[in-house]
Amino acid sequence: MDTGTHVVMGIALGGIATLDPVVGSDPAMAHAVMIATLAGSQAPDIDTVLKLKNNAVYIRNHRGFTHSIPAVLFWSVIIPAILYLFYPQADFLHLWLWTLLAVVLHVFVDIFNAYGTQAIRPFSKKWVALGLINTFDPFIFISHLAAIAIWYAGGSPGITFLSLYIILVGYYLVRLIMQLRIKRKLHEMIHDEIESIIISPTMKFRQWRIAVTTAHAFYVGRSMEGHVVILDTFNRVPVPETDVMHAAKQDDNIAAFLSFSPVYRWEVDTFKDHYEVRFIDLRYRSKGHYPFVAIVHIGHDLTIRSSYTGWIFSEEKLQKKLKLGSI
């Protein structure tokens, strides 16, 4: 989820914590727990600073190790340990438990995004992405703001936020049912044997992005108001084992893209003084354009000249990025 949603979830969890007698009966303890749940709700996203280095490092690592089981345990210990220095009278066990719950909740809700996390690392480096909830979901965010307003107006924080989360469980179940219906329709529409279906949510409640992989083709579509439409179809052509493609895969930007994207197509163009290899993620079609790409320019001597991976919405901007990234 986005930073703002994690913040309001941290506040909500701090409110629910007041139902714990150890927390609710001690204002200082309640204050410490609120700080802990806010910190715990943000800690796994500390890897966002990797954006300052480059997109390749960020794509490879964001929501990776910082969302893993060892990291969850680390955050749940270090945060209350620091807070205990300032709140020595706090009950450390309960402070730790609420911090742990905040970190676990952060990782858990991120699993439901299309991006996913490496939540089961170190047992597996697989990205777990259920694709039920958009990174920013208006209903989830606004409902949290409403609950915070009720608390501010004098409502019980514990009862208010606990009631909200019961409602949100129902909301997630509704999203799951919607996704399953789309999958059923896709199996009815596509007669080729389906290998995988990726359904990604959007900001709009009843609109989803679709990418289907079969043995021979990729199908890209949308589900709008319950109607599934296939917008593009691409032949599924294996990536060739050529010297140019081998050189491309050695580039950090290309390698990062391939480690992250589960469904993509590729293009190779030959120019007077270089080759251009392009990989295009098929999950994020927007207004007829596929904005998430990785591209590399390779000289005829197979040396990397420039490369880029990330979100690009015009060819002009892409070429500027490549010029800035020239080696």
UniProtKB/Swiss-Prot annotation:
Transmembrane segments: 68-88, 92-112, 127-147, 148-168
Induction cue: Autoregulated. Transcriptionally regulated by sigma-K. Expressed during exponential growth.
Cellular component terms per the entry's GO annotation: plasma membrane
InterPro entries linked: Transcription_regulator (IPR053170), YdjM-like (IPR007404)
Main location: membrane
Keywords: Cell membrane, Membrane, Transmembrane, Transmembrane helix
Membrane topology label: Multi-pass membrane protein
Disruption phenotype: Cells lacking this gene display increased rates of transcription of mutY, fabL, sspE and yfhP.
General function of this protein: May act as a negative regulator for the transcription of mutY, fabL, sspE and yfhP.
Record's protein name: Uncharacterized protein YfhP
Organism taxonomic ancestry: Bacteria, Bacillati, Bacillota, Bacilli, Bacillales
